[in-house]
Amino acid sequence: MQTLFLSLLAAAVTVHAYGSGGSNWDQAYSRAKDALQKLNQTEKVGLVTGVKWMGGPCVGNTYKPESIDYPSLCLQDSPLGIRFANPVTAFPAGINAGATWDTQLLYARGAAMGAEAKGLGIHVQLGPVAGPLGKNPNGGRNWEGFSVDPYLSGVAMEKTIRGMQDSGVQACAKHWLGNEQEHYRDTISSNIGDRAAHELYVWPFMDAVKAGVASVMCSYNKVNGTWACESDALNNKLMKEELGFPGYIMSDWNAQHSTVNSAVSGLDMTMPGSDFSNPPGSIFWGSNLEAAVADGSVPQSRLDDMVTRILAAWYLVGQDQGYPPVAFSSWNGGKANVDVTADHGTVARAVARDSIVLLKNGHGTLPLRKPKSLAIVGSDAIVNPAGPNACSDRGCNNGTLAMGWGSGTAEFPYLVGPLDAIQKRAAADGTKIVPSTTDDPTAGASAAAAAETAIVFINSDSGEGYITVEGNLGDRNNLDPWHNGNELVKAVAAASKNVIVVIHSVGPIILETILAQPSVKAIVWAGLPGQESGNALVDVIYGDTTPSGKLPYTIAKQAADYGASWINAETDDFPEGLYVDYRHFDAKGIAPRYEFGYGLSYTTFKYSGLWVNMDASAGAANGQVVPGGPADLFEVVGQVSVSVRNNGRVAGAEVAQLYLGLPDSAPATPPKQLRGFQKLMLQPGQTGRATFKLTRRDLSYWDVQQQKWVVPSGTFKVYVGSSSRDIREEGSFRVRRGW
């Protein structure tokens, strides 16, 4: 089935590669500078200023100049599909895409989203998400991003951006920087140490810039005491100078706080141009910016730079070549006059399916083998009776959970609920279904007692802080299942000898109560699977596909083990530093329940033949700055490979993972860090070779004194395995000091 998908994918997504390398930016800049000469001052200001909230068909719109052939730019959410429009595809969330660990699917998802955005006339799609990274396991918007690990998140950013922009839409990497919680997000100062900032939070943005991302969105919060959208250190020095970003920085909606400071500190576009209620005096740019340039408060060169960056991004992805007009309005129900979905449901189903993580499978409970009867228990098994889009921006948790809430959502064209999909399969198998689609423990136990096997559906939701759901102001109040999920599982487990638990969640939940039930034989994490939820689940639990997802974060035994959570204060000093998620667990010697990178299969894999070839010298990266950072930072300096054999009786995909431990000469470094992965699809008895190419950056740490990436001298440890703790092969290599 996975082999078949690749051929279907070619038909599902047609892209045209415009390229995102430095030479293409050079060409785009040349054209942008020519266009700049034709614009008057008011037109220039119009290109960098939103027309105000609800001032056009999209959530963000700019003014259309008359002097050049350039549109009113349409900017639209979200990172998992098109918000406020229909019909569109509601793709699995970023956290699911990350859980696939599949670079082909990451690209395909990005390309399909980009194709839909272009078809609707959207110029800038507001995604993907690298921040929040997810240092707080209950952070409200973690699910919009790909992983708590910067390396995995960075690869996902790169592949997604390339897919989106190859389809013709401008991508927007967000939220820059330190937006790790929803509580106090409009006022909090994220005080991040220089080294932790570079090695964790900036890292995936480096990959985004290297991939040629057109735009970056600065966040609501302060960073080290200064608003992110008017931070010279963050935007000019770090993003534009150190990372060599040629594109433009836009504000998050109403994240701008000044006229002059934001302009001279590197902001290039303000959105949406006014406060949401459009009060007088809420427009910082527009005529105010024009006046500031006229009196010299903002240099003319700064305004021209803003405009050039915005125009260059437009040329970079080829939007000057027959781009379609906007085909919907966000404010009248979003009905589009064109259907852009094609067969992107194929991509959505593949991502949802291959992101499913099998956490437990005692006694070979899964896959199901035509059981005589099945109890389906829990409200999470069915679609919200009021409809999948009944709550604005998905701001409720009624029925099965397939995406979180907030601006990072999309309208479901349909939602296949788990019960519906299982009933369809059960009818073909002759299996009797005994449903209990509430969260009442007594009713659930009654249904379970009447069936051979019971499947209990539980969930945990979160989202953006402008919506509060069941007392959760964006961030989750705790890491427990919602709707009394633990009690529901306990009741069902007391009534049935064979219980399977399916989890739809935005992030980790504490599973100790569930694991304490002897009759809970299998646990499946399905995340936020989007419109194809039920179909993808059936593909896996019935064995049509072997599960191949791996956790993009750690599941702890207790919430306190994470050492981080959102704080009820307006200052977060990021005391954990580099030690986030598995880095923290490893350094502190804390045993997780399920570690980062973990995921079971219906088959087994044997690793052998580790090979290491390295040609690196110690020292700092000093190359010319290119998009992403110093050019020599991205040079390949070595290679690691390992053989993986499928020892089982069914085909399966294994994610081989490479972790590196830096030498003792590197100060205060986590024991190991992810630095490579490859997903191998293997038939029974087949052996494949996973190969990991290592760059100087992969071997480096950020030296706060030198203000450079430095490869330390000494012995590096090499760990290759099936997860961050299931290490199958170990080795080492030595790096000597350069001359």
From Swiss-Prot:
Annotated TM spans = none
Cell compartments where the protein resides:
Secreted
Q: In which pathway does it act?
A: Glycan metabolism; cellulose degradation
Q: Does the keyword Hydrolase apply?
A: yes
Alphabetically, the GO molecular function entries are:
beta-glucosidase activity
Indicate which residues are glycosylated according to the record: 40, 224, 398
Q: Which GO terms describe its biological process?
A: cellulose catabolic process
Keyword annotations of the record = Carbohydrate metabolism, Cellulose degradation, Glycoprotein, Glycosidase, Hydrolase, Polysaccharide degradation, Secreted, Signal
Residues in the signal sequence: 1-17
What EC number(s) is this enzyme filed under?
3.2.1.21
Write out the catalytic residues in the record.
252
Can you state which reaction this protein catalyses?
Answer: Hydrolysis of terminal, non-reducing beta-D-glucosyl residues with release of beta-D-glucose
Q: Which family does it belong to?
A: Belongs to the glycosyl hydrolase 3 family.
Q: Supply the PANTHER family for this chain.
A: BETA-GLUCOSIDASE, BETA-GLUCOSIDASE L-RELATED
The entry's function note states: Beta-glucosidases are one of a number of cellulolytic enzymes involved in the degradation of cellulosic biomass. Catalyzes the last step releasing glucose from the inhibitory cellobiose.
Q: What is this protein called?
A: Probable beta-glucosidase L
Q: Can you name the source organism?
A: Aspergillus fumigatus (strain CBS 144.89 / FGSC A1163 / CEA10)
